Amino acid sequence: MFVTAAYAQSTTTEGAEAHDAAAAGEVHTETGVAHEGEHGSGVFPPFDSTHFASQLLWLAITFGLFYLLMSKVIIPRIGSILETRHDRIAQDLDEASRLKGEADAAIAAYEQELAGARAKGHSIADTAREAAKSKAKADRDGVEADLAKKIAAAEARIGDIKSKALADVGAIAEETATAIVKQLIGGTVTKSEIAAAFKASAGN
């Protein structure tokens, strides 16, 4: 009886251990991890050669999705942006060229107008200079003619005054000479005699 009970207990213990081992094997099978993983080689899973096939598959799928995203979305959008910028740059260059042409034309017109204004200014200055010279010459000629007339009139007046003065001096001299002769010799002389005497003295 005692032996039978001990045998039954050992049998029960062995059965429990076998059941636990079977359960552990099922758990490892369901998780996809080998039982020897607990005591395994310690290799990092991405570097494990048993996983290369699945890694290559996911790499191909990821690359394909990335290629589709690039070719269908990103690259067309970048191309559209580049084309828009290219068109805008071309328009800006055309506008800059047009503005440069307008600026060059405006500068040429300004220089032409400036040259015309300078030529007109020189012409006006030359005309004014010639007109001033002509007016100055005419004024000078008029002044000289006026002075010549005044000088001629003054000379004529001076001649008249001189002639009158000389005539008065002759009469005074004759009267003085008559008075002197009368006082010296007590006689009288005629004006003709005194005039003849003055002429004779003037001739000497």
Swiss-Prot record:
Main location: membrane
Membrane topology classification: Single-pass membrane protein
UniProt keyword annotations, A-Z: ATP synthesis, Cell inner membrane, Cell membrane, CF(0), Hydrogen ion transport, Ion transport, Membrane, Transmembrane, Transmembrane helix, Transport
Pfam families: ATP-synt_B
Top-rank taxon: Bacteria
Transmembrane segments: 56-76
InterPro entries, per database record: ATP_synth_b/b'su_bac/chlpt (IPR002146), ATP_synthase_B_chain (IPR050059)
Gene Ontology MF annotations: proton-transporting ATP synthase activity, rotational mechanism; proton-transporting ATPase activity, rotational mechanism
Subcellular location: Cell inner membrane
Gene Ontology cellular-component annotations: plasma membrane; proton-transporting ATP synthase complex
Sequence similarity: Belongs to the ATPase B chain family.
Function: F(1)F(0) ATP synthase produces ATP from ADP in the presence of a proton or sodium gradient. F-type ATPases consist of two structural domains, F(1) containing the extramembraneous catalytic core and F(0) containing the membrane proton channel, linked together by a central stalk and a peripheral stalk. During catalysis, ATP synthesis in the catalytic domain of F(1) is coupled via a rotary mechanism of the central stalk subunits to proton translocation. Component of the F(0) channel, it forms part of the peripheral stalk, linking F(1) to F(0). The b'-subunit is a diverged and duplicated form of b found in plants and photosynthetic bacteria.
Quaternary structure (record): F-type ATPases have 2 components, F(1) - the catalytic core - and F(0) - the membrane proton channel. F(1) has five subunits: alpha(3), beta(3), gamma(1), delta(1), epsilon(1). F(0) has three main subunits: a(1), b(2) and c(10-14). The alpha and beta chains form an alternating ring which encloses part of the gamma chain. F(1) is attached to F(0) by a central stalk formed by the gamma and epsilon chains, while a peripheral stalk is formed by the delta and b chains.
Name used for this protein in its record: ATP synthase subunit b 2
Organism encoding this protein: Sinorhizobium medicae (strain WSM419)
Gene: atpF2
